[in-house]
Curated annotation (Swiss-Prot):
This enzyme's EC code(s): 2.7.2.7
Keywords: ATP-binding, Cytoplasm, Kinase, Nucleotide-binding, Transferase
Keyword Transmembrane (UniProt): no
Family: Belongs to the acetokinase family.
UniProt xrefs under InterPro entries: Aliphatic_acid_kin_short-chain, Aliphatic_acid_kinase_CS, ATPase_NBD, Butyrate_kin
One GO cellular component, as annotated: cytoplasm
SUPFAM superfamilies: Actin-like ATPase domain
Listed NCBIfam families: butyr_kinase, PRK03011.1-5
PROSITE patterns: ACETATE_KINASE_1, ACETATE_KINASE_2
The protein's enzyme class: transferase
Name of the featured protein: Probable butyrate kinase
Catalysed reactions, semicolon-separated: butanoate + ATP = butanoyl phosphate + ADP
A GO BP annotation: acetate metabolic process
Length: 355
């Protein structure tokens, strides 16, 4: 049996919407938001009415009768740490998102928009595998200093979707497989997935793991400490050096990997060095996650937008294919992943979780 489900993915400069009937897309649309449109809003919460109007306009433009919907699902935002799965949107969840209790991001609006429409239609609303999915084994939380605990913040939605898809192609259940999955995008997260749980993963947001097109990843602590007290940068500027202006931007002045590849193919030495170093760091993290799984790795999966780059993935494959087979699952279809999670719950294949 298939169900009509609206999926909502609010991003920092776009709102992505799609209606599915089972796994069939009835329509999909991405609405881009200019900086001028968003300039009047002081924070993400102030954008709610603006995004709501976008949602209603898109539904009306496609002539879809919202009364046919059987569920609405939004991108999960910054919440308290939770296990992976599909969650019913509750008032407690909405309160935490409205208060930005665990951080501010455009994805915080996903559950809020989903619940508003679902409540009007008296149907359920959900989120699926938010970025705060935390399934880390206890030993992985220990950082090396008692005042700091390692946190799980990663591209959980795409990790889980890629893991389930590859497991299905292999004729297995994701919950019975051991994978090392690397999401390669503006941020990079590499996780050890043991029997359906991400038991260790780098914090892809706060300065941990490989550097990426715009994030610094792990840095030598003493040098960064010196920078903090040098008086050269404010706290906000230092944070931007970690997230937003780190990684490739700091080395080459761009976060466009198309531009970086063009420089590499033109033989620019600095570009080749940075490009190779990023692939090296990703490969090293994959190796570390293979140790977490004690070498029992069914496959290494490379996913995300950068997985489309044959030049980049080939460098990772060269350094890791001695561990196990490397499978490329490029891109990240977050709307499809949101829909799949809800379809499984509505069909009774999974039970929804409560926040």
């Amino acid at each position: 049996m298939s169900f009509d489900v609206l999926t909502i993915n609010p991003g920092s400069t776009s709102t992505k919407l799609a209606v599915y009937q089972g796994d069939k897309v009835l329509f999909e649309e991405t609405v881009r938001h200019t900086m001028q449109e968003l300039a009047d809003f002081n924070n993400v919460q102030e954008q709610f009415d603006f995004r709501w109007q976008v949602l209603r306009r898109v539904m009306d433009a496609h002539g879809y009768d919202v009364k046919k919907l059987q569920a609405v699902v939004g991108r999960g935002g910054l919440l308290r740490p939770v296990a992976g799965g599909t969650y019913m949107v509750t008032e407690k969840m909405i309160d935490d998102l409205k208060e930005n209790k665990y951080g501010e991001h455009a994805s915080n609006l996903g559950a809020m928009l989903a619940k508003k429409l679902a409540d009007e239609l008296t149907i359920p609303s959900f989120i699926v595998d938010p970025v705060v999915v935390d399934e880390m084994q206890e030993i992985a939380r220990i950082s090396g200093n008692a005042f700091v605990t390692r946190k799980s913040i990663f591209h959980a939605l795409n990790h889980k979707a890629a893991g389930r898809k590859i497991a299905k192609e292999l004729g297995k259940d994701y919950e019975k497989m051991n994978f090392v999955i690397a999401h390669l995008g503006g941020g990079i997260s590499v996780a050890a997935h043991r029997q359906g749980k991400a038991v260790d993963v780098n914090n892809a947001l706060d300065g941990d793991g490989p550097f990426s097109p715009e994030r610094s990843g792990s840095l030598p602590m003493n040098d960064f400490l010196e920078a903090c007290f040098s008086g050269k940068w404010t706290k906000r500027e230092l944070h931007e050096l970690i997230v937003g202006r780190g990684g490739m931007i700091s080395y080459l002045g761009t976060n466009s990997m198309l531009e970086v590849e063009a420089k590499v193919q033109a033989g620019e030495e600095k570009a080749i060095e940075a490009f190779d170093a990023m692939a090296y760091q990703v490969s090293k993290e994959i190796g570390a996650c293979s140790v977490v799984l004690q070498g029992k790795v069914d496959a290494i999966i490379l996913t995300g937008g950068l997985a489309r780059s044959e030049l980049f993935t080939s460098k990772i494959i060269e350094q890791t294919n001695w561990i196990t087979s490397v499978i490329i699952e490029p891109g990240e279809d977050e709307l499809e992943a949101l829909n799949s999670g809800v379809q499984r719950v509505l069909a009774g294949l999974e039970k929804e979780k409560e926040y």
